[in-house]
Curated annotation (Swiss-Prot):
GO biological process, one term: removal of superoxide radicals
List of residues binding Zn(2+): 104, 112, 121, 124
Co-factor requirement: Cu cation; Zn(2+)
Residues making up the signal peptide according to the UniProt record: 1-20
Stored PROSITE patterns: SOD_CU_ZN_2
Keywords, ordered alphabetically: Antioxidant, Copper, Disulfide bond, Metal-binding, Oxidoreductase, Signal, Zinc
A UniProt-annotated Pfam family: Sod_Cu
Protein name, per record: Superoxide dismutase [Cu-Zn]
Catalysed reactions listed for this entry: 2 superoxide + 2 H(+) = H2O2 + O2
Known role: Destroys radicals which are normally produced within the cells and which are toxic to biological systems.
Amino acid sequence: MTRPLALIIFLVAILTNTDPSRSDAGSDPVNYLFRGPVTAVAAIAGEGEHAGIKGSLTFLQKSLDGRTVINGTISGLPEGKHGLHIVDSGDMTKGCYITTAKGHLNPFNLSHGAPSDSARHVGDLGNIYADDTGISVINLTDTVISLFPTPAFVIGRILVIHTTYDDLGRGGSPVSKVNGNAGGRLACGIISYV
């Protein structure tokens, strides 16, 4: 038997498993293949004049319909609040610049908002705060983003830290409803499975 044929048979067996004695068996291949928990990481780095910014964020989602917990530390940031967003791109060939990274991840075509808003971009994660030493300790829980293959899937997307704070779509201008007036990009990293 050739390797490709063996692989196809193996995948078909997994996707069609309906053994009633197994609690994880069933007709949903996403739940079967991704039983969770699922973990991911984004290695954050600045460029050019922001090259001193670095850190790492970990993502944990325990089940397909579960919340995603984001933890980590970023150093080298200017003191203050900074918008934190996931953009609809994974292409960093030109770095973190606006010409490379597209707009916020928004598969449902909604306006920009706060993480707690019922209608918002998938990629709207609000603000982080850097203290007077340039360190931001991040502990967030989000109910929208997903590490599982759904429309809110963030694996392979770019996580961006902005120059200024995100007004959460409440700035009263058209730009506020697009990007929260969060300014340019300080640092970024691609979200990848661990």
